[in-house]
Amino acid sequence: MSEDTVFTVAGQDWDDVVDAVKASSGGGGSEGGEERIVVNMGPQHPSTHGVLRLILEIEGETVTEARCGIGYLHTGIEKNLEYRTWTQGVTFVTRMDYLSPFFNETAYCLGVEKLLDITDEVPERASVIRVMLMELNRISSHLVALATGGMELGAVTAMLFGFRERELVLDVFEMITGLRMNHAYIRPGGLSQDLPEGAVEKVRELLALMPERLRDMENLLNDNRIWKGRTQGIGYLDLTGCMALGITGPMLRATGLPHDLRKSQPYCGYENYEFDVSTDTGCDAYGRYLIRVDEMKESLKIVEQCLDKLRPGPIMAEDKKIAWPADLTLGPDGLGNSPGHVREIMDSSMESLIHHFKLVTEGFRVPPGQVYVAVESPRGELGVHMVSDGGTRPFRVHFRDPSFTNLQSVAATCEGGMVADVIAAVASIDPVMGGVDR
């Protein structure tokens, strides 16, 4: 594209764009179709999953070049972690990939525990609850992927189904942690608090209802001619391309490779759970859709096993240099700390109060060293590289977010295809910009 044939248009209907190009190229002759136009899709666009900017060079209806513009949701989380204690860091990392907060928290806490060398001291009950919450979170995240992907292709019913079912999962999260998102519930050494009364029954109700709701979603889309026409063969990326770009998650498993960190590098006791790794050989958007639906079914199986494994016991490591002296719980009026918590800290001894004050304000010290820990998030390998200089704050924390890595496949999956298929290709990647920009 030469410098004299650059057309800048914004906020117009597509027909207006085409007319402007034809008018500029000499009255609508055949040469108009040969011109290449650069179009900005986003960052404010209903089909780009947040503030993602796609720079598309198109010739007619064909995409000749596709690039990503990121950084519109940069929040400086990794830098902020260097100015907070190890425990306070959980409050930040849970806000990165905001659709799968429990995975952010678990990856971070597993890294801190590895540096402290207390991985084996985390109580079994805490690990079981972590797995249960992560798998419920996988379901809620995949439901958003299917709902938004369906909406962008015109399947409004799929969007309604997806968000309706997600509400059921978020109700469970709200009951257990007090929040629908950004929980900060998982802490280094265990959990912030135990399951409330009635939580297990609430999860069992969800397990009874969800399989039927997932079948409704499958009946709606699996054999739908329009859905298959818009997704089969779209966003194609084979195993060679995935390996070259470092792609993980459903995109990689859609090539037929059963790569799942829960199986290859088990954490939180995943080796003790029975589940299958979902794969497909389509290498396209339709295959990724099938994998996400199948993964939700497998997650339900894992959650059921978690409920069977739940045994009474502590939910925090016993090391008093790490664990707070008492569980923080609300008072009977819903405000302030409970009388039991205050009594535990203040009535026992002055030393206990001093210890609690120092532990909360200054934080615990972590031995110098560095670790890399990874978990299997709904989008792929979520890794954390953590460096400690022996202080009460991290020296450096870097996250390998799967959305960031997987977005590098945009050029490979979109170039040479049609403009309309860019929407389906990006939706099948399922990027979350909070994790990309951090």
Swiss-Prot record:
It catalyses: a quinone + NADH + 5 H(+)(in) = a quinol + NAD(+) + 4 H(+)(out). It is a peripheral membrane protein. Signal peptide: none annotated. One of its GO terms (molecular function) is NAD binding. It is found in: Cell membrane. GO terms for cellular component: plasma membrane. It holds the Pfam family Complex1_49kDa. Its main location: membrane. It is an enzyme of class 7 (translocase). InterPro entries: NADH_Q_OxRdtase_suD, NADH_UbQ_OxRdtase_49kDa_CS, NDH1_su_D/H, NiFe-Hase_large. NDH-1 is composed of 14 different subunits. Subunits NuoB, C, D, E, F, and G constitute the peripheral sector of the complex. NDH-1 shuttles electrons from NADH, via FMN and iron-sulfur (Fe-S) centers, to quinones in the respiratory chain. The immediate electron acceptor for the enzyme in this species is believed to be a menaquinone. Couples the redox reaction to proton translocation (for every two electrons transferred, four hydrogen ions are translocated across the cytoplasmic membrane), and thus conserves the redox energy in a proton gradient. This is NADH-quinone oxidoreductase subunit D. PROSITE patterns: COMPLEX1_49K. PANTHER family: NADH DEHYDROGENASE [UBIQUINONE] IRON-SULFUR PROTEIN 2, MITOCHONDRIAL, NADH-UBIQUINONE OXIDOREDUCTASE 49 KDA SUBUNIT. Belongs to the complex I 49 kDa subunit family. Its EC number is 7.1.1.-. Keywords: Cell membrane, Membrane, NAD, Quinone, Translocase, Transport.
